[in-house]
A protein has these predicted regions:
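Short C-terminal tail/terminal secondary-structure segment
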Residues: 2-5, 102, 153, 232, ...
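Conserved glycine-rich cofactor-binding loop
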Residues: 13, 20-21, 44
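C-terminal substrate-recognition "lid" of short-chain dehydrogenase/reductases
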Residues: 86, 125, 140, 220-249, ...
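Substrate-binding pocket helix/loop in short-chain dehydrogenase/reductase
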Residues: 103-105, 109-114, 212
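Active-site helix of classical SDR
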Residues: 128, 164, 172
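Alpha-helical segment proximal to the catalytic Tyr-Lys
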Residues: 133, 177-181, 240
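Residue(s) in the substrate-gating loop at a strand-loop-helix junction
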Residues: 148
Length: 259
């Protein structure tokens, strides 16, 4: 029998890091549109509040909390405020990431690499350990890490970022083994090139963009909403049997292979 509410998130509370723009903003908006109460988080509160305003104007419910993924105490506060506001956390989306270096590995400074790994990997482990016990107690939860197809290939421009995203995929598999027995579904999304401010150095480069579009089966780069829908799937009943996986949403770059 068809279940018309397979993607319904009514009654659920979702916390989204990096939620003020790009992919994160789309995830916030899409989850709110499907009924979730959303905690929009990023470093800058005004940007989060703008997203919240848009959600509320469309009849959704959301609140803004400023937090930097580089500071564990700020993430602890994010989780605490979310619980104080909505009494629970059902969905945790780790979308925020940093990539302060664009260039060859020969020029990568050690402290920059350490920052990338802490922000893009360690922060996700912190958040899982913060929200996991509550989800385990309820025997229900969804934990989503936004990775990248860069995790699955090499890069001459953003190798350190790609390494961190590969580590996230390994983290997802290990967390799934640890928390899956509590009915917590832990998965990753690996977007291809998406037209966001974060990836502007790539899509705004005519040569890189043309190369990406020529490789993609769909012959285009992605938009934030192309990823927001995947997150809704993983957070909803539609994704109830998906755990420890990475969903590639890249327009067919990897799947199409070389021509």
């Amino acid at each position: 029998m068809t279940n018309p509410k397979m993607f319904d998130l009514s009654g659920k509370v979702a916390v989204v890091t990096g939620g003020s723009r790009g992919i994160g903003r789309s995830i916030c908006e899409q989850m709110a549109a499907h009924g979730a109460k959303v905690v929009v988080s990023s470093r800058k509160l005004p940007a989060c509040e703008e997203v919240v305003k848009g959600i509320k104007e469309k009849g959704g419910e959301a609140t803004a909390v400023a937090a930097s993924i580089s500071e564990k105490a700020q993430l602890e506060n994010l989780v605490a405020v979310a619980r104080k506001t909505y009494c629970r956390i059902d969905i945790m989306v780790c979308n925020a990431a940093s990539n302060p270096y664009f260039g060859p590995l020969t020029g990568l400074k050690e402290e920059v690499f350490q920052k990338i790994m802490q922000n893009n990997v360690m922060s996700n482990l912190w958040l899982m350990n913060m929200v996991g016990p509550e989800m385990a107690e309820r025997k229900d939860g969804a934990f989503i890490i936004v990775s990248s197809i860069g995790a699955l290939m090499g890069s001459a421009h953003i190798a350190a970022y790609c390494m961190s995203k590969a580590a996230d995929l390994s983290l997802v598999k290990s967390l799934a083994m640890e928390w899956g027995k509590h009915n917590i579904r832990i998965n990753a999304i690996a977007p291809g090139l998406i037209q966001t401010d974060f990836a502007k150095a790539l899509w705004d480069n005519p040569d890189i963009r043309k190369a990406n579009e020529s490789k993609a089966a769909l012959k285009r780069i992605g938009q934030p909403d192309d990823i927001g829908g995947v997150a809704v799937f993983l957070a909803s009943k539609a994704g109830a049997f998906v755990c420890g996986q990475c969903i590639i949403a890249d327009g067919g770059v990897i799947g199409a292979g070389a021509e």
